[in-house]
Regions:
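Mixed-charge, Lys/Arg-enriched low-complexity segments
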Residues: 36-91
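Short N-terminal "domain-start" leader segments
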Residues: 1-40, 82, 86-90
Length: 91
């Protein structure tokens, strides 16, 4: 399993992928808005603390998501670290 950031048109998505790259699950994301960056970490319930708006920089928004470790909610996600390389979106 691997966790990595993937570029999108208005931000980045945090992806949990299996080793064969057959299963790709979005576990978080950051998008640019007029007021800064909005960030969220996926959850299986209602947890408003897993989303934040108006973060000043992309790096701070990504750090917010990574600190919540949303990939650990999924089987096989324990103990993983985020790959520092941002990947482009598949075409």
């Amino acid at each position: 399993m691997i966790v990595y950031w993937q570029s999108t048109r208005k931000g980045q998505r945090l992806i949990l992928s299996d080793d064969d790259n057959e299963i790709n699950e979005e576990v978080g994301g950051v998008r640019e808005t007029k007021r800064g960056f909005d960030a969220f970490a996926k959850t299986f319930g209602y947890e408003p603390g897993r989303a934040q708006k108006g973060i000043p920089t992309m790096e701070e928004a990504k750090e917010f998501v990574e600190l919540l470790k949303p990939w650990e909610l999924f089987s096989g996600g324990d103990g993983l670290a985020v790959d520092p390389l941002v990947r482009s979106a598949p075409e």
